[in-house]
Structures are given as C-alpha cells and as structure tokens.
Amino acid sequence: MNQLFTKTLMSAAIACSLCNTANAQLSSNPDKFLGNITTSWNNDMDTDGFIFSDYWNQVTPENATKWGSVEGTRGKYNWGGADKAFNYAKEHGFLFKFHTFAWGSQFPNWLRNLTPEERYEAIVEWMDAAKEHFPELPIIDVVNEAVSGHQNDTPLIKEALGGDGKTGYDWIIKAFEMAHERWPDAILIYNDFNTFQWNTDEFIDLVKTIRDAGAPIDAYGCQSHDMLSYDGKNVAPTFKSSMDKMHQELMMPMYSTEYDVGTEDDELQLKAYKEQIPYMWEADYCAGITLWGWIYGSTWTTDGNSGLIKNKVERPALTWLREYMQTDAAKNAKSPFPGMVKEASVYVKPAAIGVESGKVLPITVNASLKTKTIDHIDLFVNDELIGTLTNAPYEAEYTPTAEGKYDIKAIVTATDGTQFERLSGFKVYPARTPYNGEKEIPGIIEAEDFDGGAELFSFHDSDNKNEGDIKDYRKDAGGVDFVKGNGGCAIGYTATGEWLEYTINVKGAGIYSYEATVSCGSGDGSAFSIDVIKDDDLVNLCKVNVTQTDNNQWSTYKVMSGEFKVPLEAGKQIIRITIDKPYVNLDKIELKLEGTGIQSVKGDGLSDDQPLYNLYGMKVDKNFKGIIIKNGQKELNK
C-alpha cells in the first residue's frame, strides 16, 4: 500500500491487554478505536446512568484541552477537565486525544493584544506547558480548521507562526514541527470540517502540500459533521466519492474525528450510520472513529439531536452500531496503526516543493522507529531508485530535467524486514523570468510586472481565476487579478496570504524609502509586507499599513510612504510583496536610496539635448558618471 503502515502487529501481550480492556465496549478491534467526547463543559464521563467505558474505547475532551479553556489568564493553567479525561482513559486502558494546539477559535482573549512576535512566544509557552503537564501523549489534533474561510481569526495564529511562506502553509508546517519536537511518538493529525462535502479539494491541497514539504504529519482528520445533505433530509451524496478521492490523493492514514448525524429522524440517522460507519471502519487506511457526543440534548447540534441516547433509551443507530461492531468485518478490520500506536516516524522533506528545471534538489528523509531499528531506506523519484540510504542523516540529491509534477517515495526497511512507506512530491517549473526585465533600484516597481514562473514559485494567489477587469495583460499569472486603476493596470482583489515576487538589481546599497501607490475602499484599511529573500528565508524590510483611500471605492489611489528597516545590498536579488490584510489594490512602488534622494538609475539613453547638472549645479554631459539632476530629479547615471 502507498501509505505509512506496518506489516506486523504489536506484541501479543499488548494486543491482548487492549482486547481485555475493551471487552465491555462496543468495539473489540485491537487496532482501531471507536471513541467519543466528554459531555458538556463539566466533562462528565458517565451521564444519566450510562457509563462511557461501556460504549467507547477512546476519549477526546470536547473543550478541556483547547487553549482558551486552559489558559484564560496568561500563565495560569487549568488542567482540571483535561486531567479528568486523561486519567479516565488511563484507568480504562484506552486512548486519550489532545484537541487542539493551533486553532483560529477558542484561544485566550488576551492573545489579541499581543504583537506577532509576542503571540509566537505565547504559543511556545502554551505548548511547553502542555508538554510539562502531559509528557507523553498518544494522539494530537495539532492544527484545527485552517482551510481558508473556516475561522476568521486564523490569521492571528498564522501570522505568529510565520505566515503562508513559500508553500502557502508554512505556519502549519511550523506548528507540526513544534508538536513533533515535544511528542515524537504521538500520532499528529491535521483536522478540519466539510471534507466530504464542499471543501474536499481545499482540504486535499492543504494536507498534500504540508506532507510534500516534509511536515511531521501522520494522519488527516475528517471531522465528519457533513454527513447529511445540505437540506438535512438525505445522507451526504458525495461521502464515498470524497473519501475515495482523499485517499487516492493523499495515501495517508485517516481518522473520522468528530462524527455526528444531527437529526430528530431516527430512520435518517440510522441510514447514515449504516452507509458511512462500515465504509470508514473497514477501510484499512482508517485508524479510528470518534463520535462527537452521545447523549441527546448534550451535543453541539440543534437541540443536541445528534445524540444516540434519548430519554434514557438507545436510538436505532446506536442499537445497530452495537450489532455491527460484533461482526467479523468490524472485529477484523485492518488499521494503518496496529495496536493503535505509531511505530514509524517517516517524513520526506525536499529542500523546496517548487524548483527550476536543471537545478539540484536536496532531499532529506527524517526517519525513526519506536521499537525497531532501521536497516536502510530506498528513495524513489517517479519510481526511479535514486539512492539506498544506510546512515543518518538520510540525504540524497536529484536534478530534474523536465517540467511537471514529480512523486517521491521513501521505503524504510527495518532489520526485521518490516517496511514503512512515505510519499512526498515537488513541481518543476521553467526558469524564473523577470517580467519586462529586472527592476533597477533606485526605481519603480510596477505591481503587475511580477516575475514569471508559476503558482507557489514566483507568485501565489488564493484561487486560479483572474477576477479583474483586465484579462489580456498576462497569460502566465495563474489566478492573480489584474484591474484597471490609476490610469493603467494594477493588482486587485487581494486576499490575506497572497504574494508576488520581483527580481531587482540594486545599484546602490543602503537604506531605502518607499512610496507605494495604492487604493483601499475598506474602512478597516489594509496592509502588506515587503521582504527580501536571503538563503531561502524571508527578511522583512517593512510593513505598509494602508488607510482607506475612498469609501467603498477602489478607484482613488494615494501614496503610502515609509522607510525600510534594514538596508538592501547591492546586486541582483528577489523581493516579495505579501498581503497581510485584504482588499488593497497595488499600482506601483517607488524605491529611493535614503539620504541621496535618488529616484532612478540610468545606464544609457541620455541625449545631448537634455540639460544635466551635478550636485553642485554645474552642467555636465551624458557621459558623466554619478548622481545627476535631470528635470529637477536626482538620478544615478552609471
């Protein structure tokens, strides 16, 4: 199989122990769990005389491990509810899941008052506190609901962890790296909703991108709240096709993390359970199912109607679920994590997920085994063996010669013959091409003339459609939006996280000032950052806060000015403009070498009939090298 898996089970003693503790529960499968959540804010495990451990063999606190619940006051941690669930799981011998670390909702209110740097420190402190309190965690929802549009406050977390970056999801990768550093043996999950309907493709793109970039993600979590049709009258029509698509695209372990069917109609709920639970449970890449509540009236859905016990009576779906879990198909269903634990941590990390044709791409395989020993790793690119790696660090190089998508596969072989697989990938692009030539600095950068290349290579847009009113300016710009503005062409319909890169040639090193010609009709204003790329890292030059230029109109352009906080070096380099706050139209940015007033650089093209002067007011000819004054403006003639 093309997924992370092990061909051998845990020791008989561990497996037997799990079976013995699960005898009273609905599932007796030793390799995948059927779990549930704590009920209500009081974290009840047993409700109305019904005992949690009689039904379920995994627990997720509904709220007790969310940041806002734990650290309402900075530096003061309330672990009471989390401890109750953790100790209950430990007492009964089943799994406890930590939910969740990075989420654009239910974080402490005091986080809003911090700078991005201070927010980052707060996140580090939060994760360190969790590590100190729970030194060992078996399974974690690391990042929750980060698909674009799912949580309005996601940018608060995103900005603190480094933003979109080169992959579009650098901040998520950072969160997973932080979790893996603290809990290397934990199963690390990305969790989101609307994965079976409405946002399947967006979910796949996010998970696949961070996987390909080498994030230590072990599984994807489908919340599974979207199990009925939009009108709530039928079972979700795209459930099976979406589940198949996610597996085919990702080839990773999957969890159903928050399954519920919210309806008062017993027959509709039963129908959904019958169609959906076996399809997930019997998939050998599905590692477990967690139901999101079980007592009617005590779940998050309308009137708590997803509950399975109503008026102290089991609803038909629960009666059926009990019967199904006793079938051979349910008992013997395979899992990507035998024994419900992670044996292998294998993550393939190419130096970049986008590379120019003909350039060397370093590839690293970060691999470790919990109880076994690695013998060797076979590394493939598009099914071609490029190396057999026997010693850590496990590194190789590959030079692509053609454009397109490339698949990477690492097969880790242990000394006992057990094998584990991990996929990754990268794209090969044509060489970066400065559009309308390199931008000489001091000088003007027209926003629409960003470098040619490809999406996530020389630019990034949140969709693949040009929604502007200029359709024919460029054909190599993906979904970047070109609009009429300020008498010419501008970039419009900007969204947070989008970016554009420009190749510049700096003629004079030093601190530069900027004059950005922009428009913004939003009363909240907008913002963007300018960074220079050094050794594949972004070095911030400035953040431009854009005030409203006209009320709900984007036709009025004004100049926002300021100064870079670090100097530019002389020579060729790449700068990036990143949208930090949406709804700004970008026309152009003029860069001047501070302290000189130089507004542009001229290499040739000066004519004899142009009056030219040096800084002392003396007339010079076109052959003079240095700072000249032409038409009242300073230029550097080289």
Q: Which residues fall in each region the model found?
A:
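Glycoside hydrolase catalytic-domain groove-lining segments
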Residues: 80, 85-90, 95, 165-188, ...
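Extracytoplasmic
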Residues: 339-390, 397, 401-594
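Short, acidic/polar
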Residues: 40-53, 121-130, 199-210, 272-277
